Regions:
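Rossmann-like adenosine-cofactor binding region
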Residues: 208, 212-292
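Phosphate-coordination loops involved in phosphoryl transfer and adenosine-cofactor binding
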Residues: 51-56, 164-168, 274
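A short helix->loop->beta-strand "cap" motif at the edges of active sites that frequently abuts
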Residues: 131-133, 191-192, 270-276
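Phosphate/diphosphate ligand-binding glycine-rich loop within oxidoreductases
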Residues: 45-154, 285
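Positively charged, low-complexity intrinsically disordered leader regions
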Residues: 1-73
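Glycine-rich phosphate/diphosphate-binding loop of Rossmann-like nucleotide-binding domains
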Residues: 61-73, 153, 158-239
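Adenosine-phosphate binding glycine-rich loop
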Residues: 274-275, 280-331
């Protein structure tokens, strides 16, 4: 599996840059591997030697809690040496470019770089120029967040068994959401129907194009009226309002957004009786989603966080280890 191959110096490294180039079979392979990693997390001793001797660097140019920590935990459970590197306090503060930082890490013998960056395409840049290092995209600008989309797909599949024929409603700030872009690819490749809902000002123009490329998205419908969009939904995913990425003028008022697009118990009454509720986090509780729903019986939000560790274990394992046997670490 993997999204892109780089062949150099006799190596064949694979990168996870986005979901759009993954086939359905590749996605299913990742989700199956995630299930195996979930079993590891249920063991009394949560440690396996699969990546012993491998060096993983988490290189984050943006703040993160869930993604960074889950990657670090995933690497350590697999017995890799994990180095946490942020832009502050490093040579980046002195003006070093991303590429030069990557080349330095490659020269040090790093095996995997997990990169979060404010500029779209930054992981692709490293993948192109670092033949000896595997790159995993942990979120780049407004472009993509493949690991979040894959863990969300796994979370739904673990509940329903399949996404085929399901109606999934994604609500909120789609325009600024890299999660939504990757989720649309993941969910539709697995057979789900996607409905987007939110203010027209927060819906991207030209939904059938991704970053101007000729990659046509599978059918996606837009229904600004959330009460209409949610009818018969199997899954409802709320997106965070990306205040740090907005220049203002997208919403008439926060009160209006809450009134029209907050996920509430009353609104969910028109969805499927078994509807599941998700949020990729961080969550503005009481804005995108009511407290009652966020912590209610239909919420998968905590499971998303738990599954994030297993999914990232699976990705680190697949880009680093190939066919190594997952065995339990004995003290």
């Amino acid at each position: 599996m993997g999204s892109e191959n780089v062949n150099a110096a006799g190596t064949n490294r694979k990168h996870i840059l986005d979901v759009d180039v993954l086939s359905e079979d590749e996605i299913i392979s990742i989700l199956d591997q995630t299930a195996a990693m979930s079993e590891v997390l249920r063991r009394d001793i949560k440690k396996v030697p699969a990546l012993r001797g491998r060096v993983i660097v988490t290189l984050f140019y943006e703040a993160s809690t869930r993604t960074r920590i889950s990657f670090e935990e995933a690497g350590k459970i697999l017995s890799a040496d994990v180095i946490n590197m942020s832009s502050s306090g490093s040579s980046v503060d002195k003006g070093e470019s991303l590429l030069n930082t990557g080349l330095t890490l490659q020269a040090m013998g790093v095996d995997v770089i997990v990169l979060r960056h404010p500029y779209s395409g930054a992981p692709n840049l490293l993948a192109k120029h670092l033949p000896k290092v595997s790159i995993i995209n942990a979120g780049d600008g407004l472009h993509a967040h493949p690991t979040q989309a894959l863990l969300d797909a796994y979370t739904v599949r673990s509940k329903w068994g399949s996404l085929n024929g399901m109606k999934i409603v994604i609500v909120g700030d789609v325009l600024h959401s890299r999660v939504a872009r990757s989720a649309i690819w993941a969910f539709t490749k697995l057979g789900a129907e996607i409905v987007l809902s939110g203010p027209n000002t927060l819906m991207p123009v030209g939904l059938n194009l991704v970053d101007g490329r000729a990659n046509v998205l599978p059918p996606v419908s837009v229904q600004p009226d959330l009460d209409e969009a949610i009818r018969g939904a199997d899954v409802v995913m709320a997106l965070r309002l990306q205040n740090e990425r907005q220049n203002g003028g997208y919403l008439p008022s926060l009160r209006e957004y809450i009134r029209r697009w907050q996920i509430t118990k009353d609104r969910l009454s028109s969805a499927s009786k078994e509807v599941l509720v998700m949020h990729p986090g961080p969550m503005n509780e009481g804005i995108e989603i009511s407290t009652e729903v966020a912590h209610g019986g239909r919420s998968l939000i905590e499971e998303q966080v738990t599954n994030g560790v297993a999914l990232r274990m699976a990705l680190l394992y697949q880009v680093s280890a190939g066919g190594y046997q997952i065995e339990e670490e004995h003290p």
